Amino acid sequence: MGIIAWIIFDLIAGIIAKLIMPGRDGGGFFLTCILGIVGAVVGGWLATMFGIGGSISGFNLHSFLVAVVGAILVLGIFRLLRRE
C-alpha cells in the first residue's frame, strides 16, 4: 500500500505543478502523472544532495513542497526540450 500512497502523493504534486505552470504539453493526464512522479523523485534527490531541510521522508508539508518544486523543475525542463 505504501508505493500506491507515494504515487498518489507525487501525482498531486504533478497536478499542482501543472496548475502553477499552465500550458499545452500534450500527453494529458498520463504526462502529468509521469512528470509528477519523476519531479518528486528529482526534488527529493536534489534536496537531500544539497542538504535542504534535513531528511525528506514521510508525508509532510516539507516533503510535499519539495515534490512540487521538483515537478515544476522537471516540467520546465520538459518544455525546454520539447521546444527545440
Curated annotation (Swiss-Prot):
Q: Where in the cell is it found?
A: Cell inner membrane
Classification from the root reads: Bacteria, Pseudomonadati, Pseudomonadota, Gammaproteobacteria, Enterobacterales
Q: Which domain of life is it from?
A: Bacteria
Q: Which family does it belong to?
A: Belongs to the UPF0410 family.
The protein depicted here goes by the name UPF0410 protein YmgE
TM stretches of this protein: 1-21, 27-47, 58-78
Keyword annotations of the record = Cell inner membrane, Cell membrane, Membrane, Transmembrane, Transmembrane helix
**What would be one Pfam family of this protein?**
Transgly_assoc
Q: Give the species this sequence originates from.
A: Escherichia coli (strain K12)
Topology term for the membrane: Multi-pass membrane protein
Gene Ontology cellular component terms for the protein in this record: plasma membrane
Q: What is its main location?
A: membrane
The UniProt entry, under InterPro entries, shows: Transgly_assoc (IPR007341)
